[in-house]
Amino acid sequence: MVQKYQSPVRVYKYPFELVMAAYEKRFPTCPQIPVFLGSDILQEHKSEDGALHVVERSCKLNVDAPRLLKKIAGVEFVYFIQKNTVNWKDRTLLIEAHNETFSSRVLVNETCSYSVHPENEEWTCFEQTASLDIKSFFGFESTVEKIAMKQYTANIKRGKEVIEFYLNELISQGITHLPKWTPGVPAGWHPLQAFRSGITRSNQAEQTASQGPCKADAGSHSLAAEPSTPDTDKLEADYIERYLGQLTPMQESALIHLRQWLQETHKGKIPKDEHILRFLRARDFNMEKAREMLCQSLSWRKQHQVDYILQTWQPPRVLEEYYAGGWHYHDKDGRPLYILRLGQVDTKGLVKALGEEAILRHVLSINEEGQKRCEENTRQFGRPIWSWTCLVDLEGLNMRHLWRPGVKALLRIIEVVEANYPETLGRLLIVRAPRVFPVLWTLVSPFINENSRQKFLIYSGNNYQGPGGIADYVDKEIVPDFLGGECVCNIPEGGLVPKSLYQSDEDAEMSDHIRLWTETIYQSSCVWKGAPHEIIVEILEEESVITWDFDILRGDVIFSLFHSKRAPDTRQRELALAAGNAPSSNVQLIDKSWTLGVDYSRVQAPLVCREGESIQGSHVTRWPGIYILQWKMHSSASGSSMARVDDVLASLQGSSHKCKLMYYFEVLASEDFRGSMSSLESCSGFSQLSGVTNTSSKSHSSSLISR
């Protein structure tokens, strides 16, 4: 398997020429990088105008590998070929490197670039990508891969420190600004040489005077740019550290790769970085597992309109009076603090009075509010806060709370929260746990993720008041009064729900299962091999607009739009509707006896849609009549004589016989439609989760006129 690395954008608040002078101090040897033993120049070229300088070097590295492995391989050192291309005119440096040793067995490719910051020409940006592909290595492929990745990630951080070291060395020598390239400079021109020879000192003095005080003052200058939320599709390292926390190089790379994939497949609208990071953490930064989990969650949010819950959900009066939970300041780490007096909650009464769905909606609104508070606290405290603390008081917990339907509802709610709000719980403090608690814990703990269970701290009796108690995590000033503190906690006291508020038997039966929003506009369907799913759309007026919005939940499909001269037989669909199977049934409308181009025609070019993609589009009809939306399984051989690697892997995994999708379509009358066709947006939005990117390299929105 090919291992890939993508760095965030690292910003130096120094001009490009000064950063280049620091970079070139690494050659031919660099004591600050022990594994780098030296380099020899193989080729060198300078353009006549001095704008371009190309150097190709052979670099000698001492890889920290077991001596036995080195002996088997028969090498003591590893050699790389590095080609550096400096363009002084454009102020860019491109570094291309690949391994020379064992190039037939191991392929290592690295590309780095230095360039001027797009918003400040006195700053310099650095980016880095690399790939590792081990074809064979004497049966030690896995070992070599681990060693190589360990060495590489260790040197990433070291490389930044080396640049900072040499920048500080230059500043200590009084070199804080170097001249830029200008037409007419002597052949072999170099900024540092020009500075030292005094060729352009007068120009530099004029430039410094026009720019005001020097930005590179050693006493007050920082090597890192002030972090800001990125306005482009690229993440900056300082932004990650400021808003997302300390990540290892490979964790940063996983975040960037998953974010790029979402940008390409979700039409420029993607979850916020902190939410993507939560799913990566939940899957130990395994990008494929995190991608699958995140896509399922995004589809769930869209289908049940969870993004709008804070705007639309109003807790019933019963919850406001008898649900003993609420937000209460923050803990010592700045995390939002939620307090739940579970022992005072009449779980049976709430379920009987409201049903499971209302309780689930309330729990979801709490989680959405928690994410919002984390963002606010991040800005308030100046450090990344992406989880909250929950303090659960079990005083009053008894066998009444082990009511079987209530426990079942709790377990289902836990499953929903674990799947869609991973890594949001920073710490769970359980206080005054009674003797009955182990019984409840035995029932609940198997449904809680192992990472979440490790964050639980359980106190029985009054142990929470002693050393190691809640005072270690919550300031004494905000410890609730019912736990012996001085702070008044404004949450309901709970208590028994009056039976007069219970639902009738009919209402209780309707609330027997968690359904969330039954009025969801999305439908689900499966696509089988040889059995596409098709929808008939009847258009009464020409120039009407057919819009669609669908998500591919499993497998790859081909989406097409047809205009039919014949009316399809809809009896199969009517039978499915009568059987109540419409949401997930597969309906085929185009008769096998029909001929494409005679009985029906294609008006929308086939679009291959990959698993996890979110597709939105539109079509302006030229004629009234019957239109058919079709989703059929994508064959790896379609349109190509060579099968894609992804398709082969999918078939080997046994998932190639069934696809699943979630879709919505609508017809807009021509007089009701306003705006550009390509501006049609999905019917869902990530009101709490999303950030909109400026560009998307792959847009699935279309606006075609029938021909």
UniProtKB/Swiss-Prot annotation:
Highest taxon above the source species: Eukaryota
Organism annotation: Xenopus tropicalis (Western clawed frog)
Comp. bias regions, Polar residues: 201-211, 686-695
The GOLD domain, residue ranges: 518-667
Family matches, as PANTHER family: SEC14 RELATED PROTEIN, SEC14-LIKE PROTEIN 5
Name of the protein in its database record: SEC14-like protein 5
Chain's gene name: sec14l1
InterPro entries: CRAL-TRIO_dom, CRAL-TRIO_dom_sf, CRAL/TRIO_N_dom, CRAL/TRIO_N_dom_sf, GOLD_dom, GOLD_dom_sf, PRELI/MSF1_dom, SEC14/CRAL-TRIO_domain
Bias-annotated ranges (Low complexity): 696-707
Domain (PRELI/MSF1): residue spans on this chain: 3-175
Domain CRAL-TRIO residues, every copy: 315-491
Gene3D superfamilies membership: CRAL-TRIO lipid binding domain, GOLD domain
CDD domains found in the cross-reference section: SEC14
Region feature Disordered, mapped onto this chain: 201-232, 686-707
